[in-house]
Structures are given as C-alpha cells and as structure tokens.
From Swiss-Prot:
Cofactor: Ni cation
The protein, known as: Urease subunit alpha
Record's catalysed reaction(s): urea + 2 H2O + H(+) = hydrogencarbonate + 2 NH4(+)
Species the sequence originates in: Staphylococcus carnosus (strain TM300)
NCBIfam families for the chain: PRK13207.1, urease_alph
Subcellular location: Cytoplasm
Entry binding sites for Ni(2+) 2: 221, 250, 276
Highest classification ranks of the organism: Bacteria, Bacillati, Bacillota, Bacilli, Bacillales
Signal peptide stretch: none
Subunit structure: Heterotrimer of UreA (gamma), UreB (beta) and UreC (alpha) subunits. Three heterotrimers associate to form the active enzyme.
Location of N6-carboxylysine modifications: 221
Recorded metabolic or biological pathway in which this protein acts: Nitrogen metabolism; urea degradation; CO(2) and NH(3) from urea (urease route): step 1/1
Entry binding sites for substrate: 223
Post-translational changes noted in the entry: Carboxylation allows a single lysine to coordinate two nickel ions.
Length: 571
C-alpha cells in the first residue's frame, strides 16, 4: 500500500532529497542534492514509532561479526565532500568509514548495504550535513588549548611545529631536533586530535636534518626567521626527496639571499608547500604570489587575510610586529613589517582562491591568526566571491555545488594529499578514519553540532548535566566519552615519517595513540590538488603591487559585512 506526501512533508521527516537545495548558514551558497540513496518508504529512522526497531529496519539475527553490520549509522544525512553532495546513510565500523549508502534490514528492505543490528547505535542525520574533519596544516603549537578550539570549529587534524610559548614556536612552525620532536610526540598523547610535527629545515649538514626525520618529523619547515636561503632550502629538499616528506616554506620577505626567482631556482621542479602564498604572512616582497603559477608549488593561504575586509590592513601591522619579535623603536623593523602588508595582493588573494589557483586554507595559529576560524573564513571567502564574481562554471541559481566542492577541498582533502595523509583522513570515503563533523545547516561553517573522532563522539553541543533532557540550557560544547580513558589515545592518529615508523618509534616512546606513516609526497604536483589545480601565468607590478592573471588585472573590494559573523556570536 503506497502513501503520498508533499515534498515539504517528506523533507521535514527525512531531510532534503534529490533536487532540493540547502542554504549554508547565512551565506549566499546553496548545496543541491545530486543523489539520494534512500528507497522512498524504507528510510531508516530512530525513535518512538520509527522504523529502526527489532524485526523492522533493525535485523534481529545478525551479530557484529558480520562485516556489513555497522557499529554506528548516521541516518539520512547530507554528505558534502570535495566530489559529492549526496543524501545517504553513513555506516561506521571499528572507527573507520564502512560505507555510505542505504542502511537497514536486508531481510525486509531492498538495496541495503549497511546492516543495522543489535550492536548498532544511531545518530540521526535527518536535516543535517556531514563533512570530513578539517585539516589545518599551518599550526604553531604554542598552546595545547588550540586543539579544543579547533575541534569546536570542525578541525580534527593539526600539522605544524612548536614546543609551547617559546619565541621560536611563536614565530615558526618548528619542533627543532630529536629531543623536542620526541617530547611533542609524547605530549600529543594527551590531545584529542590527529597531529604531525615539522622539524627545523635550516642546516647545511644533511645529518642535522635527517636526524629529525628519524625522530618522527613528517617534514621540515624552512622559515626566514631561521634563514630561508636558497642553499638551506635546497639542502632541506634533498633530504625530503630521500625520505618522502614535505617541505613547508616561509620564504625570504627581505629578499636578503635572493629574489623569488632565486628561490624557485633552488627548489627546481621539486614539490613544496608554499605557506601564505599571498605574502602578508611572510615571503618574498612583493611577488611571492607568483609562485602559485608553478606546477610543483602547492600554495596555501593563512586566514588573517581571508576574506579581504575593511579591517584587514589595520589589523596586520601589530600582528607582524608581535609574532616576529620585532621592535617598534627600530625603523628597520617597522619597514620589515610594512613590506609584507600590501592591499593589492591581499585583494587578489580571494580571487585566486576562487579561481582554484590557491589550493588550501590554514590558520597560522596564534602567530598571525586564529586557530578556530579556518572553516568559517573559507566559507566567507566563497560567499564574497559569489557576490563579486557570480556563479562558477556549471553553477546556477540554488546550485553552487562546484564552488562548494572547490572550497571544502581547501581544508580537507588537499591538505591531506599535500602532507601524505590522504590514505587515512581528508574525505568521506570507505576505509578512512571516521573523523566526521555534523552540522545543522543554519550553523554550517561556524558552529558544528557534533564532532566524531574515529567513530566516537568526541565533542558535542549538550545541555546541563543535571537537566531532565539533553537540551536543558546552557547548551554549549562539552567533552564526550571520546576524550576519556583509553579513547583519548585510541581515537586519534600521530603521523610520523616512514623511517620513524619502520624503526618503531611507537615502541621507542611507548606511544599509545595510533601511529601512521606519511607517504606519497615527493611525486605530487599541483594537478593532484582536487578542484584547485589551476596554474595560470601570474605577474605583480613592482611599483603598484597589482596582480595580473594571464595579463588581466584581478582584484576585489574589501567587505564591510560578512556572513557567519556577529549574529552567531552574541553570547
């Protein structure tokens, strides 16, 4: 016996279906469902009088040993990823993504590929959005509280360096030498996120670099505050090629040892992660931005310049002075800071992100920007660029899927690929760690509802513990059981170099977290950056600092008002 209902009735019960559009927060972006795995009338839903009951959508016979039986199912969720906007059930088993598809009881339902049994828990995803956990690849490990702030924004992986509130850590993403690297690997045992640490990349003696890779560093950071000379950079890249790790570069702002072209000659055709490629965060003044046109450069932005607003320029001078230990009474220090802040290149940066020329977004946590705003600022840029540049090719009214896929890739899959961890995290694909973020669409990009780490609920919005219901105010982010006991170490990964992994760094340091090697880095090119692989010719006028793409001037107007901003932070 069939039953008919209106589209609005269906959506209120089971969430949007194919062809429906969802507004993301208070932005001007709309995600349209491309595919729905549901069989209408056979949706799995939990609750009183709902279908997930014994003998109905829950199979009464299967045990957990059946490989199709999930530990957890997120029902009827909208999955937004770099390659899809799907409506599906999402199965999790042993902490990994088992499958997205149709969940239920195959004895009485068609097309079931995720079985709900007595060992299965349910998270209701009706009307919710699920994304992969974000990855921030420019983290100064200055303060361990950064991990919790990042988690509450939807970021589940941190890559960078530092040792606490030292001057070196405040200025450079470096954990220098085996002793510091080992201590940070041990400290990570108490953090609720995935981590990987970068060592110091300045040494003409290869042995001084190699020992850091053996100690567990997943790459090296070459930073101008330690000396970003072409020679130091070339030596670091030699070691990276031998050990399949990444080099992250904060280039030479003062052009002391050479210009942008000299740096590129030292790099040759070797892959490199170019930090804050616009240049306000540091790097060859005024034309570091040109490096984004090279096929071996994987360019990222840090978020202080994203998006370009009426306040951006004024904010930057003090940030540069404090972060890089400069003295306001020394004219040369003031000149150094001023040389990095150019409204013309900052205005071009948003456009280059929108064109897919810049591939990633990161934070530069406490060292020129905010660890909890990577995701928010990414979507603010997407909103501003739609306002100023219109639809991307293939998009149309109530369907911004191409732009959405481009921007979500910037803080999920592309950082994972760049640092050799995409086998484990970075997207919603079978076999990857179930690091998942669940959003109410009205709060998308700014305040997630729940964060899962390796399939365990790690952080969630929840009410007063003495309340009669879980929504008793005050509603706020609270640690869940994924952060307690053995789950703290059992649900997060510490990434290390392959040589450290092969030498059993886990046993050497008595680490209890999952330890996994980075891999597949040195053969990368910009073509591997999902939805963000453009390499047009870039030029910068040395007098006006205007930026040209294939000979055409690009710029944007500073925003006076943004979405995902004050209306979400009244309390």
């Amino acid at each position: 016996m069939s039953f008919k209902m209106t589209q609005s009735q269906y959506t209120s019960l089971y969430g949007p279906t194919i062809g429906d559009a969802i507004r993301l927060g208070d932005t001007n972006l709309f995600a349209t469902i491309e595919k729905d795995f549901a069989n209408y009338g056979d949706e799995a839903t939990f609750g009183g009088g709902k279908s997930v009951r014994d003998g109905m959508a829950q199979n009464p016979n299967v045990t957990r040993d059946d490989r199709y039986v999930a530990d957890t199912v997120i029902t009827n969720a909208v999955i937004i990823d770099y390659d899809k906007v799907y409506k599906a059930d999402l199965g999790i088993k042993n902490g990994y993504i088992m499958k997205y598809g149709k969940a239920g009881n195959p004895d009485i339902m068609d097309d079931v590929d995720i079985i709900i049994g007595a060992s299965t828990d349910i998270i209701s995803g009706e009307g919710k959005i699920v994304t992969a956990g974000g990855i921030d690849t420019h983290v100064h490990f200055i303060n361990p509280e950064q991990a919790y702030v990042a988690l509450e924004s939807g970021v589940t992986t941190h890559i960078g360096g530092g040792t606490g509130a030292s001057e070196g850590a405040k200025a450079t993403t470096v954990a220098p030498g085996p002793w510091h690297i080992h201590r940070m690997l041990e400290a990570a045992e108490g953090l609720p996120i995935n981590v990987g640490f970068t060592g110091k990349g300045q040494a003409h003696n290869h042995t001084a670099l190699i020992e850091q890779i053996h100690a567990g560093a997943i790459g090296l950071k070459v930073h101008e505050d330690w000396g970003a000379t072409p020679s130091a950079l070339s030596h670091a890249l030699d070691v990276a090629d031998d050990y399949d790790v990444q080099i992250a570069l904060h280039a030479d702002t003062l052009n002391e040892a050479g210009f942008m072209e000299d740096t590129m000659k030292a790099i040759k055709d070797r892959v490199i992660h170019m930090y804050h490629t616009e240049g306000a965060g540091g790097g060859h003044a005024p034309d570091l931005i040109k490096s984004a046109s090279y096929p071996n450069v994987l360019p990222s932005s840090t978020n202080p310049t994203l998006p370009y607003t009426v306040n951006t320029i004024d904010e930057h001078l003090d940030m540069v002075m404090i972060t890089h230990h400069l003295n306001a009474s020394i004219p040369e220090d003031i000149a150094f800071a001023d040389s990095r802040i150019r409204k013309e290149t900052i205005a071009a940066e948003d456009v280059l992100q929108d064109m897919g020329v810049f591939s990633m977004v990161s934070s530069d946590s406490q060292a020129m920007d905010r660890v909890g705003e990577v995701i928010t600022r990414t979507w603010q840029v997407a909103h501003r660029m739609k306002e100023q540049r219109g639809y991307l090719d293939g998009d149309k009214e109530y369907n911004d899927n191409n732009r959405i896929k481009r921007y979500i890739a910037k803080y999920t899959i592309n950082p994972a690929i760049t640092h050799g961890i995409s086998e484990y995290v970075g997207s919603i694909e079978e076999g990857k760690l179930a690091d998942l973020v669940i959003w109410d669409p009205a709060f998308f990009g700014v305040k997630p509802e729940m964060i899962l780490k390796a399939g365990m609920i790690n952080t969630a919005v929840n009410g007063d513990a003495n309340g009669s219901i879980p929504t008793s105010e005050p509603l706020k982010y609270r640690k869940m059981y994924g952060q307690y006991g053995g789950n703290l170490t059992g649900t997060s990964i510490t990434f290390v170099s392959n040589i450290a992994y092969m030498n059993d760094i886990e046993r050497q340091l008595s680490l209890h977290r999952m330890v996994r090697p980075v891999k597949g880095i040195r053969q990368l090119t910009k073509k591997d950056m999902k939805n963000n692989s453009e390499t047009p010719k870039l030029d910068v006028d040395p007098q006006t600092y205007e930026v040209f793409v294939d000979g055409k001037l690009i710029t944007s107007e500073p925003a006076k008002e943004l979405p995902l901003a004050q209306r979400y932070f009244l309390f």
